[in-house]
């Protein structure tokens, strides 16, 4: 009797283990494992622009099987802005491993940020190690300050275009574009353009239909043409 019970328990354990192994294999084949997600590190500072962060965060953040969002700043702790939207961040120097990609927003804080050598150094280091680098609005001024955009195409907020361009005189600035791709670097125009760029990034990685489906889910009219910014004459 005891031996039969033992055999039954062994059989059940074997079947359970086989089932778990099969589920894990299926999860991996579907790309749903944590190991297959890309970490996007948002590099923040005080006086960041709200939608520069939360627009792309809404798009990438809802795709939990593909992207993981983390938030960092030089000092760590809470960063905020003129809209009084606080975000809890981790300290950049405490980063355990390099992220797959970074996103640098714009905002009034970039005016001080371009003079912050430590911030620029951290952005440069992370940009060099990341597979992709995204900037929104005047965030491209911070990236330009690193020198990594020299001889590359880029764009920025049209209302602050002249100031941003002055931060990278060797950059090939495109005033007409909604967003620009040059290698691993994605730079967008102002504020809401970060959402268009994020959807463009999804289209590049997962296909246009996937990006359109994501835009539809958030009830957003995606400006699909990256070469045509309707706000190009704003400045």
PLM region spans:
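Short acidic alpha-helix initiation/capping motifs at coil-to-helix transition points
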Residues: 190-194
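Sec-dependent N-terminal signal peptides
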Residues: 8-15
